[in-house]
């Protein structure tokens, strides 16, 4: 990474990513200027304390930040809107200067590390003794794997597992444990991409890189993949949009000499929009619905940004229930005297899988199962166009999952598919999947009051997330849903169908409540208005019947009434707690 030394770079935006890029360049001997439109961004004190040699400039992003200066490269923070940075970016490109982001630097760093062993990196003093992350040595221990269900055999044992009647054993016994189901088997029938060479090999550092994006479900799937990979016995680092940043995490592992076998990256459309030469081992686009159109300009640009995660040759994991995602699969390439060459991929979805290597859900005798398909007999040669006979492998019952809703079942399938593509064995991952409790504020069960369960989905800040939560949770019971907030210019009409099918009533809050009411007017569901979250919870409780659920999934940003989505969640939880106390229920 000596090519980074003695460079003069400009970083636009002092957020978490901007600070991480400044740290990265400084550690490699560059001269750095950070520019921000804000006079005193929140991380300015941190920048000045950690990196006193870095110059900070506040004010509008104008061409003179690069024109007539010594700057030789420009890097932007992902949250900055293209229109805001356009004067600088356009000027830089006109001068022939490279323009990139944190993902580009991370990709280049991994490419550089392939050329030398991790030991040589340390010997060359390319890493300083201190890390920007105080808990660097614990990064690969991203999940607690102290307990695991005992080894199971067959579908009867899985059914027992679903009811929680299985004896537990230590994590060390699980990594090489028996399959959870006779059908689970090993992974020979699936497109595994094998594990990387260890970091200390002379051949250089060659990790598996797994990348996740999508409008909704990114954080859940990223966190789950990290835990499953670790359960499969591999060292793992989880970074990106989920936090911590890509470069801070890489720096911490370099400092601790703990480069992981597998990287699991959550990437937003902002990070992917201008990414260059990013080629992960395997990647998934979970779904694409309207979001961030004010940033991208239109839906086509938003979809194109998401699709960049697949690079040129990355193994693709696709949501077959989402037409926009399936359109990302390239057209088969015609080859003379051979069948058309299809890009390596597999799919997941809420229905039964239809081709070998795909994942889905199958219902047998009233019990829904996570399943995958394999070719029944791989030794049989088939004629062109002849249908493949499938063997459906039952992996585990949906009831064994602690994360709720059909949408989370498909998230689980996506996580399994991505981890299997990294060469991870299925058996230990199924144990880990059963233990995963989900992420805060994402269809999180917080209380049961008088036989009505209350769910916090405050992270449901767009229509797609709320539609998925309604369909997923509504498959089990009727819902009273709390909607509303700052709508970000979204079209709320896609909520009409899931509300009509799954909601008993809707309570509306916030700035864009009138727009949501208009979109749901024909749904024939009671629409109620509330001036506060406390009133919304009271109205929802009054509308709910025994066995129903109250779902706070606003489909909107929170800034009209709250500090952020976490504050909104806390106010909701406090209101439910107060309701329980009023009704004499101890939580």
UniProtKB/Swiss-Prot annotation:
User: What Gene Ontology terms describe what this protein does at the molecular function level?
Assistant: ATP binding; tetrahydrofolylpolyglutamate synthase activity; UDP-N-acetylmuramoylalanine-D-glutamate ligase activity
Q: What does this protein do?
A: Cell wall formation. Catalyzes the addition of glutamate to the nucleotide precursor UDP-N-acetylmuramoyl-L-alanine (UMA).
Chain spans, region Disordered: 124-147
- Which annotated residues bind ATP? 214-220
Task: Quote the EC number.
Answer: 6.3.2.9
Q: List the disulfide bonds.
A: none
User: Biased composition, Low complexity: where in the chain?
Assistant: 132-147
Q: Can you tell me which family this protein belongs to?
A: Belongs to the MurCDEF family.
Q: Does the keyword Repeat apply?
A: no
Q: Which cellular compartments is it found in?
A: Cytoplasm
Query: What is the organism of origin for this protein?
Result: Polaromonas sp. (strain JS666 / ATCC BAA-500)
Broadest EC class assigned to this enzyme? ligase
Please give the superkingdom of this protein's source.
Answer: Bacteria
- Which Pfam families would you find in this protein's record? Mur_ligase_C, Mur_ligase_M, MurD-like_N
Q: What is this protein called?
A: UDP-N-acetylmuramoylalanine--D-glutamate ligase
Keywords of the record, alphabetical order, are:
ATP-binding, Cell cycle, Cell division, Cell shape, Cell wall biogenesis/degradation, Cytoplasm, Ligase, Nucleotide-binding, Peptidoglycan synthesis
Task: Write down the chemical reaction(s) this protein catalyses.
Answer: UDP-N-acetyl-alpha-D-muramoyl-L-alanine + D-glutamate + ATP = UDP-N-acetyl-alpha-D-muramoyl-L-alanyl-D-glutamate + ADP + phosphate + H(+)
Q: To which pathway does this protein belong?
A: Cell wall biogenesis; peptidoglycan biosynthesis
- Principal place of residence: cytoplasm
């Amino acid at each position: 990474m000596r090519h980074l030394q003695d460079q003069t770079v400009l970083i636009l935006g002092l957020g978490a990513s901007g600070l991480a890029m400044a740290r990265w360049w400084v550690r490699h001997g560059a001269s750095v200027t950070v520019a921000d439109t804000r006079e005193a961004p929140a991380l300015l004190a941190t920048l000045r304390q950690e990196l006193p040699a870095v110059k900070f400039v506040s004010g509008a992003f104008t061409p003179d930040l690069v024109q007539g200066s010594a700057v030789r490269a420009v890097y932007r923070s992902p949250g900055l809107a293209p229109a805001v940075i356009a004067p600088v970016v356009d000027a830089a490109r006109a001068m022939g200067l490279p323009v990139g982001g944190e993902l580009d630097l991370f990709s280049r760093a991994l490419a550089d590390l392939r050329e030398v062993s991790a030991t040589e990196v340390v010997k060359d003093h390319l890493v300083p003794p201190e890390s920007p992350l105080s808990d660097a040595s614990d990064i690969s221990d991203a999940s607690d794997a102290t307990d695991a269900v005992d080894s199971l055999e067959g579908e009867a044992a899985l059914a027992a597992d679903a009811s929680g009647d299985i004896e537990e054993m230590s994590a060390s016994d699980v990594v090489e444990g028996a399959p959870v189901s006779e059908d689970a088997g090993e992974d020979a029938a699936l497109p595994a991409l094998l594990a990387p060479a260890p970091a200390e090999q002379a051949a250089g550092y060659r990790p598996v890189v797994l990348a996740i994006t999508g409008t909704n479900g990114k954080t859940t799937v990223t966190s789950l993949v990290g835990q499953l990979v670790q359960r499969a016995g591999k060292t793992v680092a989880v970074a990106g949009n989920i936090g911590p940043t890509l470069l801070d995490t890489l720096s911490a592992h370099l400092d601790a000499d703990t480069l992981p076998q597998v990287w699991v990256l959550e990437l937003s459309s902002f990070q992917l929009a201008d990414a260059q030469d990013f080629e992960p081992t395997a990647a998934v686009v979970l779904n694409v619905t309207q979001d961030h159109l004010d940033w991208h300009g239109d839906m086509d640009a938003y979809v194109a940004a998401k699709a960049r995660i697949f690079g040129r040759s990355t193994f693709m994991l696709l949501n077959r229930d989402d037409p926009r995602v399936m359109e990302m699969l390239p057209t088969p390439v015609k080859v003379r005297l051979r069948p058309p060459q299809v890009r390596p991929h597999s799919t997941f979805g809420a229905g039964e899988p239809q081709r070998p290597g795909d994942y889905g859900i199958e219902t047998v005798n009233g019990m829904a199962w996570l399943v995958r398909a394999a070719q029944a007999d791989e030794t049989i040669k088939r004629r062109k166009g002849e249908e493949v006979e499938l063997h459906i492998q039952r992996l585990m019952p949906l009831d064994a999952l602690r994360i709720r809703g059909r949408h989370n079942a498909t998230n689980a399938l996506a996580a399994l598919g991505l981890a299997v593509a990294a060469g991870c064995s299925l058996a230990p991952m199924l144990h880990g999947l059963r233990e995963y409790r989900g992420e805060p504020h994402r269809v999180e069960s917080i209380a049961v009051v008088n036989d009505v369960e209350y769910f916090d989905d405050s992270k449901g800040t767009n229509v797609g997330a709320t539609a998925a939560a309604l369909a997923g949770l509504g498959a089990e019971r009727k819902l009273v849903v709390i909607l509303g907030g700052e709508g970000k210019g979204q079209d709320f009409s896609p909520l009409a169908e899931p509300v009509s099918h799954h909601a008993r009533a809707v309570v509306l809050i916030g700035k864009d409540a009138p727009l949501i009411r208009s979109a749901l007017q024909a749904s024939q569901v009671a629409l109620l208005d509330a001036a506060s979250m406390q009133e919304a919870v009271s109205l929802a409780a009054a509308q709910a019947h025994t066995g129903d659920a109250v779902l706070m999934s606003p489909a909107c940003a929170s800034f009209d009434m709250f500090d952020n989505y976490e504050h909104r969640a806390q106010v909701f939880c406090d209101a439910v707690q107060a309701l329980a106390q009023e009704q004499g229920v101890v939580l």
